[in-house]
Swiss-Prot record:
GO terms for biological process: co-transcriptional mRNA 3'-end processing, cleavage and polyadenylation pathway; snRNA processing; U6 snRNA 3'-end processing. Residues 56-128 form the RRM domain. This is Speckle targeted PIP5K1A-regulated poly(A) polymerase. Residues 111-147, 252-315, 637-686, 720-755 are annotated as: Disordered. InterPro entries: MTPAP-like_central, NT_sf, Nucleotide-bd_a/b_plait_sf, PAP_assoc, RBD_domain_sf, RRM_dom, Star-PAP_RRM, Znf_C2H2_sf. The gene is TUT1. Residues 259-269 have a biased composition (Pro residues).
Length: 869
């Protein structure tokens, strides 16, 4: 327990942080779940193992360079069993010898003098260093919030200059690109020995013009037709001698570094006797903009992933062993898996400086992952990913066609990372986000980029390519294409992107880069666009493989959070803080957009799905649950109306005087929403509230629609088909005051009589007690008392009374709760939307950081409560 207490740190605003795993939890139950989880237990066991190994190990130096691990093992076995010997393979100046037990180690240290081959050995205890987690990566959603980056962007004259500056801070330096070329040349030389005629092609971030510091090195090993005798092609041209000498990495280090043993790992950087490379190096920056401010040189041993320093030396690999392994594998596994294993064996035994080789045959595109020790690069090799090579070249062509593409993509990638929208699992990949930006630029008026179909028609004779049955033809030279006539500034394009994505129908349409338009999912389309395509909450078609939805992994929650975050950003982009440089030294332009989101702001963008029911009944029940079951004081509310009659409507993107009006923005968004959804969707309530949390804007009215300053919030009438709810004569509890729901119903009936029905409802709620903590225990106790009194099963009214009683008990009152005079514990806005039948909860005042716990409780409690009502 003492060790656990040392690993756990209590946070000043509530919650706990596990210093071992670098994980933050909101409460004690979440902490207990983490401490009992696989990741934490694995690191605890690994730390104990490393400590035990250190107590059994000695540091040995002074032996000749030709001494190998077998000779050291034989010498130290005179004192007792030897568990392992790890040699310094780069210089051969020291070794770490792990004895079988602590007693044997003490016997070694008690020997006054050690001699091997006429040389006196220096033997001393291995220095113990503090354990560091092997997975000490930067946290998810890390954003460029360093003082240096803030200063660099704040000094730019306008938003466009900030975006260009961000590209310079994030992209690879020339030395880093040269280093990657050297690694590719090394791979080409080795693989040619096994597969004459093969070609190693880099793809992905390394060549698509959107590279960042520390990005992986993706390689495609093109084996061609190995059955035919072909002359071996020349390896990729290595950099000239002058350029190689100018590089911070001596090219001889790549060619002369001894091959790493299978699965071997370098000594841990926790040791003071860490390896010292002959080449000058410093840390390669990770994939965050902060890294651009560091030195643009090579990785130091301290920046490499930690590994166990006690690995048995298995000797040098050679070509014969790799071929023997390939022969053995070919009889046991399929041809594809056997070839993948052979590539892994070649990387382990024959490529200098490569370690941590892992084959992943179960991936969508099977790969072999590896790490390269001298350069600090991580990468993978694939055998059947020719399509990705053409995708990378297509992205590079797009960046060459217009100089605004790269700043826009870099900015939006950085923004999405800070909002927790991009990454692995159910999040958007960088590739999907880049394609989303390109599709947006194709749909401008006039277009910034041509469609894939237009590029295919302009492909020359030598540029006609077909891969796996898909047409990948497009010009390779951007200079032969006409430039775009669209001259909009970067700041305007960024604001338009946020506004348009927030109103696109991501589920009901397929965003096609080949056609440059949104194709309705329910329509009849040619089979070549649909065969094998997996639809989901977000549908974004690959430009060449038309059966691949690059956003198929995105969940409905992430898609909703993407659109809510875009709407919040669009609202901010209409403010003066975005448009003009602050004279008071405040963050302006891109800086508020790139700040990392707090857990509360991420949750506020996550909608809570509501059960299917007529919207007016649903909102009435929702207000009843908030007020009576949970004891929320509803201070005020707003409603949004929709007109059952047609007619001209003012664009939600409009406004005068102090609001920025984006040319072309209203037209594209309005037309897209009317064509794809049949109605106009507005998120301005949610967006304003999110920017209150994320940007810190001072908003006097807690909810307002775009309109003229000083005027009351404008009621946006949304054009919808007349539905069942619009004729029911009930609007849900807007404008609630002391009179309760009756007053709200009266007002809504009058408006319904004028042909207007409700579209969304919002309430401002205040809580003075933590009514979500201990609720299950209190409910169980009340249910037990009810059974003892002989009462039957509870109906709707009885259920509501029980929940109200639970709330009163949690508040420590015996009668109906009355509002205390102290400040509320938590204030939030609950906004119900009829568009997607969801509820968005946004914190307004949360001094103790309780909103994540409340939001987690509401996600489970509210849908169940509404079903009971």
């Amino acid at each position: 327990m003492a060790a656990v207490d040392l690993d756990v740190q209590s946070l000043p605003r509530g919650g706990f942080r596990c210093c071992l795993c670098h994980v933050t939890t909101a409460n004690r139950p979440s902490l207990d779940a983490h401490l009992g989880g696989r990741k934490h237990r694995h690191l605890v066991e690994l730390r104990a193992t490393r400590k035990a190994q250190g107590l059994r190990s000695v540091f040995v130096s002074g032996f000749p360079r030709d001494v190998d691990s077998a000779q050291l093992t034989q010498y130290f076995q005179a004192f007792g069993p030897v568990a392992s010997v790890v040699m310094d393979k780069d210089k051969g100046v020291f070794a770490i010898v792990e004895m079988g037990d602590v007693g044997t180690r003490e016997a070694v240290l008690s020997q006054p003098q050690h001699t091997l081959g006429g040389h006196r050995l220096r033997v001393r205890p291995r220095e113990q260093k503090e354990f560091q987690s092997p997975a000490s990566k930067s946290p998810k959603g890390a954003a460029p919030d360093s003082h240096q980056l803030t200063k660099a962007l704040a000094e730019a004259p306008d938003v466009g200059a900030q975006m260009v500056k961000l590209v310079g801070l994030r992209e690879l330096s020339e030395a880093e690109r040269q280093l990657r070329n050297l690694v590719v040349a090394l791979m080409q030389e080795v693989f040619t020995e096994f597969f004459p005629g093969c070609v190693v092609h880099p793809f992905g971030s390394s060549i698509n013009s959107f590279d960042v510091h520390g990005c992986d090195l993706d390689l495609f090993l093109d084996l061609g037709d190995l059955e035919e005798s072909q002359p071996a092609p020349k390896a990729p041209e290595s950099p000239s001698l002058d350029s190689a000498l100018a590089s911070p990495l001596d090219p001889q280090a790549l060619a002369c570094t001894p091959a790493s043993p299978p699965d071997s790992q370098p000594p841990s950087p926790q040791d003071s006797e860490a390896l010292d490379f002959e080449t000058p190096s410093s840390s390669l920056a990770p994939q965050t903009p902060d890294s651009a401010l560091a030195s643009e040189t090579l990785a130091s041993p301290q920046s490499l992933p930690p590994a166990s320093p006690l690995q048995e030396d298995r000797g040098e690999g050679d070509l014969g062993k790799a071929l023997e392994l390939a022969e053995a594998l070919s009889g046991e596994k399929t041809e594809g898996v056997a070839m993948l294993e052979l590539v892994g064996s070649i990387l382990r035994g024959c490529v200098p400086g490569v370690y941590r080789v892992q084959t992943v045959p179960s991936a969508r595109r099977p790969v072999v992952k590896f790490c390269h020790r001298p350069s600090g690069l991580h990468g993978d090799v694939s055998l059947s990913n020719r399509l990705a090579l053409h995708n990378s070249r297509f992205l590079s062509l797009c960046s060459e066609l217009d100089g605004r593409v790269r700043p826009l993509v870099y900015t939006l990638r950085c923004w999405a990372q800070g909002r927790g929208l991009s990454g692995s699992g159910p999040l958007l990949s960088n590739y999907a986000l880049t394609l989303l930006v390109i599709y947006f630029l194709q749909t401008r008026d006039p277009p910034v980029l041509p469609t894939v179909s237009q590029l295919t028609q302009k492909a020359g004779e030598g540029e006609q390519v077909e891969v796996d049955g898909w047409d990948c033809s497009f010009p390779r030279d951007a200079s032969g294409l006409e430039p775009s006539t669209n001259k909009e500034p970067l700041s305007s394009l960024l604001a338009q992107f946020f506004s348009c994505v927030s109103c696109w129908d991501l589920r009901g349409s397929l965003l096609s880069l080949r056609e440059g338009q949104a194709l309705p999912v329910a329509g009849d389309l040619p089979s070549n666009r649909w065969e094998g395509l997996r639809l989901g909450p977000m549908n974004l078609q690959d430009p060449f493989d038309l059966s691949h939805n690059v956003a198929a992994n995105v969940t409905s929650r992430v898609a909703g959070r993407l659109q809510n975050s875009c709407q919040a950003a669009a609202n901010y982009c209409r403010s003066l803080q975005y448009q003009r440089r602050s004279s008071r030294g405040r963050d302006w332009g891109l800086l508020p957009l790139l700040q990392p989101s707090s857990p509360s702001s991420l949750l506020s963008a996550t909608p809570i799905p509501l059960p299917p029911a007529p919207f007016t009944q649903l909102t009435a029940a929702l207000a009843q649950v908030l007020r009576e079951a949970l004891g929320c004081h509803i201070e005020q509310g707003t409603k949004r109306l929709r007109s059952d009659r047609g007619g001209p409507e003012e664009s939600p993107q409009g406004g005068t005087s102090k609001r920025l009006k984006l040319d072309g923005e209203e037209k594209s968004c309005e037309e897209g929403r009317e064509e794809q959804q049949g109605y106009i969707r507005d998120h301005s309530e949610d967006g304003v509230e999110e920017m209150v949390v994320e940007v810190g804007e001072m908003v006097q009215d807690w909810v307002q629609s775009p309109g003229r300053p000083g005027e009351p919030p404008q009621m946006l009438r949304e054009q919808l088909a007349t539905g069942e709810e619009g004729q029911s004569g009930h609007a849900a509890l807007a404008e609630q005051g002391p009179k309760g729901p009756e007053a709200a119903r009266e007002g809504s009936q009058g408006e319904t009589g004028r042909g207007v029905s409700l579209s969304s409802v919002s309430w401002r709620c205040a809580l003075w007690h933590r009514v979500w903590q201990g609720r299950r225990r209190a409910r169980r106790r009340l249910q037990q008392q009810t059974k003892e009194r002989g009462r039957g099963s509870a109906g709707t009214a009885e259920w509501l009374a029980v929940e109200a009683q639970v709330t009163r008990e949690l508040r420590g009152l015996s009668s109906a709760a009355q509002r205390p005079e102290a400040e509320p514990l938590l204030t939030f806005v609950a906004s119900a939307s009829q568009v997607n039948q969801t509820l968005t909860v946004t914190p307004i005042q949360d001094s103790q950081g309780l909103f994540p716990d409340l939001h987690h409780f509401l996600q489970v409690f509210l849908p169940q409560a509404l079903r009971n009502l």
